[in-house]
A protein has these predicted regions:
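N-terminal, polar/Ser/Thr-rich
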Residues: 10-56, 84, 93, 146-153, ...
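Solvent-exposed beta-hairpin/edge-strand motifs
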Residues: 70-95, 187, 191, 505-513
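A surface-exposed beta-strand-loop module
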Residues: 78-146, 208-211, 524-528
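Beta-strand-rich binding/interaction modules
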Residues: 82-88, 195, 464-465, 480, ...
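Acidic/His/Gly-enriched intrinsically disordered linker/tail segments
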Residues: 218, 355, 359-420, 442
Length: 548
């Protein structure tokens, strides 16, 4: 996902609240009706009707039984979408009622025939309706019904936060990705192309000359990342040889009149992939390829089919978010959404309360890309510039099990946190080994923030626990207070959690590392100290305050 800048009409996908409903728990937790079964594969078929803004479809969910609970199966499908029929292993359910729903008609509880632990089964659900329309995608989610510049239908979906159940029935929780991937079949008119995640498996011609485009995803994938794009697309093909020597197919599906622009702008892809593979390890989805798809919205990290809508220009819609000058030297949407292939798609948080793992590390990929192309000084200036976007309005980590995101500061406060960890490690090779090992150790897995925090602490040999608490779980920015008395500099932390232990680099005429605490400590600056200079390295996101 990307946060919202310079756009008066946009809002964050989820809003923090103090009280939660039963529906928040049904959406955000692993309920008993979810816990007894594990998703193995999704087979999604959808036929959209542009004229009526409606869809009909079928979803087949292959699942494994984890426990013989005797409980119903919770399936999520958001109102006003409606279930028509349900089959288990090819047998239609004839019970009346076959299911019940909650008061919002977003959550269905389906009676099952009863299954043995360890067995694998299929549920097929036929459904139809007019899905929620996205009024301001991607921040306001739903189905997108637009027309291109030549007045031709152009359709897609953006549903992170809102949930994939806005348009197809599923277990709508990040913790349960289909272990064996998914298939997405999309019907489109004869003069339109339907693009999906993964690789094109087949194209089926119908009597009315429409086509069903069948896309196969071999890797685990987040529900919200499975997305169709339907438009007047042409394909640009290329390939990339990664650091392991493997060949990665590159495919760019763009509106026909933008082909030449895309060919030029997407020359940035290979240098970007070189940089990200160097810092994060091999691209995580070689089997499914790398795609950019022109979208009727700004952009999203749809796995192996990244939504691109930045107008073939550098920066964020032509703006440098950092105001450093470096943010206009590369395409923000291309870089940010591609960075999510490692953090967000390869490594996925089980609860959206921990989404900083997606957004903080991915936002730091922007700094790393700047470093790869223009050097460390440029990267530091970009990183420091994006602090302008930090609000410190609420904690980055939110409430668990109620489908609640934390502050939008998860992006650039999160990025600054990662950068400070790098400074404290003070060894770029070691830091790189950690970012690469994260993607290797948690390859295609769902995680919690605490697991990521523990991993970094163990691999670095540095106890960052209080630093994580400070920047992720409070809104307070550490303040380094200091007093100068001739050649003596007294210093301490205030506005911090107990036992806060951020080690920082300062300049008193010479570079010095300090390990402040909440108690006053003394630095002897030396006989040649002029009693004036005391600066904190700008790579640390803290406040400095002199006491007199």
């Amino acid at each position: 996902m990307l946060t919202c800048f310079f756009h008066a009409g946009c809002s964050q996908p989820m809003h923090q609240q103090n009280t939660f409903s039963k529906q928040d728990t049904l959406r955000g937790s692993i309920t008993p009706e979810r816990s007894w079964w594990d998703v193995v594969h999704y087979d999604i078929s959808v036929d959209p009707d542009f004229a009526t803004k409606s869809i009909t479809g079928e979803t087949v969910i292959t699942f494994k039984v984890l426990e013989e609970s005797g409980l119903p199966m919770q399936i999520d499908l958001q109102y006003p979408m409606k279930i028509d029929s349900i089959w288990f292993d090819g047998e239609m359910i004839n019970k009346n009622p076959a299911y019940t729903s909650d008061i919002t008609k977003n959550f269905y509880f389906i009676q099952t025939p009863g299954f043995e632990k360890g067995s694998t089964h299929k549920i097929k659900i036929a459904y139809h309706g007019i899905p929620k329309e996205a009024n301001n995608p991607p921040w306001d989610g739903g189905w997108i019904w637009e027309k291109d510049m030549q007045n031709r239908p152009w359709m897609s979906v953006a549903c992170q936060g809102l949930g994939a159940s806005v348009w197809y029935p599923c277990k709508d929780h990040q913790s349960d990705e289909p272990n064996m991937g998914a298939t997405l079949s999309v019907r489109a008119d004869k003069d339109q192309v339907a693009v999906g995640n993964g690789r094109l498996k087949e194209k089926v011609l119908h009597a009315d000359q429409s086509n069903t485009w069948v896309w196969e995803i071999k890797n685990p994938i987040n529900n919200y990342n499975i997305v169709p794009y339907i438009g007047s697309y042409v394909q640009i093909e290329d390939d990339y040889t990664g650091e392991s020597g493997k060949n990665l197919s590159l495919n760019y599906w763009v509106l026909d009149y933008n082909k030449s622009k895309a060919e030029k702008q997407f020359e940035q892809v290979k240098p970007m992939l070189n940089c990200f593979e160097n810092w994060f390890g091999p691209y995580p989805f070689y089997d499914d390829g790398f795609k950019l798809v022109e979208a009727p919205h700004l952009g999203m990290e749809h796995q192996s089919a990244i939504a691109y809508g930045n107008g073939y220009m550098n920066g964020y819609r032509g703006r440098d978010l950092s105001e450093s000058g470096w943010g206009k030297k590369w395409d923000f949407i291309l870089v940010h959404e591609s960075g999510h292939e490692w953090f967000g798609n390869n490594i996925t948080t089980r609860d959206i309360a921990d989404m900083w793992v997606h957004e903080g590390f991915t936002s730091y990929s922007e700094t790393l890309l700047t470093e790869c192309l223009f050097g460390k000084k440029a990267a530091n200036e970009y990183l420091q510039g994006i602090r302008l976007l930090i609000n410190n309005d609420k904690p980055i980590i939110a409430e668990y099990n109620v489908h609640q995101e934390g502050s939008g500061d998860m992006y650039y406060k999160g990025s600054n946190l990662v950068h400070m960890i790098r400074q404290m490690i003070n060894d770029d090779d070691k830091f790189k080994s950690i970012t690469r090992d994260l993607n290797k150790t948690f390859y295609h897995q769902t995680v919690s923030s605490s697991e990521i925090e523990k991993f970094i602490i163990e691999k670095s040999g540095i106890d960052f626990s209080k630093i994580f608490d400070q920047y992720l779980r409070t809104t307070d920015i550490p303040v380094l207070e200091y007093k100068i008395d001739k050649q003596k500099i007294r210093y301490r932390w205030v506005n911090t959690v107990k036992d806060f232990n951020l080690k920082i680099k300062v300049d008193t005429g010479k570079e010095t590392w300090l390990s402040p605490s909440s108690s006053w400590q003394v630095l002897d600056a030396g006989a040649d100290y002029d009693g004036q200079k005391f600066k904190v390295d700008q790579n640390f996101y803290i406040q400095l305050r002199q006491k007199h």
